[in-house]
C-alpha cells in the first residue's frame, strides 16, 4: 500500500513541481532500515528494491526541512505528524509573541523584526497552505480546512 502511495506522490511531485526523479523518504522511528513497525519495515524493503529514488527512512525531526522531496507514511501517522507540527508552530509563534511583549526593549526589537517574521510565518498558515491533494482516487480531490476562502482553496 505505501509503495503505491510513494509512486503516486513522486509522480505528483514531478508533474506539479517539475522535480526530475523526486527523492522519496519513508517516515519511521529511526533512520535504520530495521526500525519501524512491520508495515514500515516491509515498505522499506520494497522501496529499496524499486527503481524509485529512495532515500531511506526519515524521522519526525526531519519533516521540516525535509531531506527529500516526498515523505510517505500511512494516513494515521501522517495526520499525527501534521497535527504535531501545527501545534509546535503555534507554540513557538505564541512564545515569540509573549517574549516580544515583555518590556519596551523587546517590543522595539519586535517592531524591527516583524516585517521580516510575518511573511515567513504566514507561509505556514491555513490561508496559505490550506490543504493537500488526496492521491489514489479516480478524480481530483483536495483535503483542506473547512473555513478556507476560495483563493486559498484554488492554491491547493
Identify what each model region corresponds to.
Residues 4-15, 42, 46, 83, ...:
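Alpha-helical scaffold segments in soluble metabolic enzymes
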Residues 147-155:
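Single conserved hydrophobic/aromatic residue that forms the stacking wall/gate
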Residues 67-71, 76-148:
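Glycine-rich phosphate/nucleotide-binding loop
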Residues 16-24, 51-61, 102-111, 126-132:
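Flexible, glycine/charged-enriched surface loops at secondary-structure junctions
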Residues 32-33, 60-64, 77-79:
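Short, catalytically relevant binding-site loops at active-site mouths
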Residues 2-57:
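Glycine-rich phosphate/diphosphate-binding loop of Rossmann-like nucleotide-binding domains
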Amino acid at each position: 500500500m505505501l509503495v503505491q502511495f510513494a509512486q503516486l506522490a513522486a509522480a505528483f511531485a514531478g508533474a506539479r513541481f517539475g522535480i526530475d526523479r523526486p527523492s522519496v523518504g519513508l517516515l519511521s522511528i529511526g533512520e535504520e532500515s530495521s526500525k519501524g513497525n512491520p508495515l514500515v519495515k516491509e515498505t522499506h524493503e520494497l522501496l529499496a528494491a524499486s527503481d524509485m529514488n529512495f532515500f531511506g527512512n526519515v524521522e519526525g525531526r526531519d519533516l521540516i526541512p525535509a531531506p527529500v522531496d516526498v515523505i510517505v507514511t500511512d494516513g494515521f501517522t501522517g495526520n499525527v505528524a501534521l497535527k504535531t507540527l501545527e501545534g509546535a508552530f503555534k507554540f513557538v509563534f505564541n512564545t515569540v509573541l509573549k517574549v516580544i511583549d515583555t518590556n519596551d526593549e523587546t517590543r522595539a526589537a519586535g517592531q524591527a523584526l516583524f516585517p521580516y517574521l510575518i511573511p515567513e510565518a504566514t507561509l505556514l498558515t491555513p490561508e496559505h497552505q490550506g490543504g493537500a491533494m488526496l492521491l489514489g482516487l479516480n478524480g481530483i480531490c483536495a483535503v483542506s480546512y473547512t473555513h478556507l476562502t476560495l483563493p486559498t482553496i484554488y492554491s491547493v
